[in-house]
């Protein structure tokens, strides 16, 4: 061993001195620095744990919020589909009601027009009968009042008809 120390040119006394200084420094470090350093390390460890727990909590909250938003979106899509379906159904019912009313009104108009045409026809026939009767009476009166030959009667009827056309 002395050979080693001789090679390093260290004396046993110097070595003991260095060991004592080193031990004293270790005691001083342990007494003054080790406590605050370990306290700082423990605080840092607690902060890291707290941050990790907070991050996990935030992640769970975000996941829950995302699930809630997804469910709300799904519900709103379902509601929109239902509203659209109801609107289409109502529009179809309204269309059918309008068409039905239009058909009924058209049938009523056709019926009234048919009745009006029948009434106009009846009125025209009645008026024509009345006119024919009046013409016949007028012709008969003229024929009776004059003693006319057949040719004169024909001329008289023709003149009377011409007078009606004018």
UniProtKB/Swiss-Prot annotation:
F-type ATPases have 2 components, F(1) - the catalytic core - and F(0) - the membrane proton channel. F(1) has five subunits: alpha(3), beta(3), gamma(1), delta(1), epsilon(1). F(0) has three main subunits: a(1), b(2) and c(10-14). The alpha and beta chains form an alternating ring which encloses part of the gamma chain. F(1) is attached to F(0) by a central stalk formed by the gamma and epsilon chains, while a peripheral stalk is formed by the delta and b chains. F(1)F(0) ATP synthase produces ATP from ADP in the presence of a proton or sodium gradient. F-type ATPases consist of two structural domains, F(1) containing the extramembraneous catalytic core and F(0) containing the membrane proton channel, linked together by a central stalk and a peripheral stalk. During catalysis, ATP synthesis in the catalytic domain of F(1) is coupled via a rotary mechanism of the central stalk subunits to proton translocation. It comes from Lactobacillus johnsonii (strain CNCM I-12250 / La1 / NCC 533). Signal peptide: none annotated. It is a single-pass membrane protein. It is found in: Cell membrane. This is ATP synthase subunit b. Keywords: ATP synthesis, Cell membrane, CF(0), Hydrogen ion transport, Ion transport, Membrane, Transmembrane, Transmembrane helix, Transport.
């Amino acid at each position: 061993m002395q050979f080693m120390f001789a090679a390093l040119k260290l004396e046993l006394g110097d070595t003991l001195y260095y060991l004592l200084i080193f031990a004293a420094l270790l005691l001083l470090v342990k007494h003054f620095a080790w406590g605050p350093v370990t306290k700082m390390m423990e605080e840092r460890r607690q902060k890291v744990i707290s941050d990790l727990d907070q991050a996990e909590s935030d992640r769970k909250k975000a996941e829950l919020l995302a699930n809630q938003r997804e469910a709300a979106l799904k519900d709103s899509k379902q509601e929109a589909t239902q509203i659209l379906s109801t609107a289409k159904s109502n529009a179809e019912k309204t269309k059918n009601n309008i068409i039905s009313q239009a058909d009924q009104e058209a049938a009523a108009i056709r019926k009234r027009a048919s009745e009006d045409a029948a009434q106009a026809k009846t009125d025209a026939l009645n008026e024509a009968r009345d006119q024919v009767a009046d013409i016949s009476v007028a012709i008969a009166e003229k024929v009776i009042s004059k003693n006319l030959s057949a040719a004169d009667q024909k001329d008289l009827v023709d003149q009377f008809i011409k007078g009606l056309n004018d």
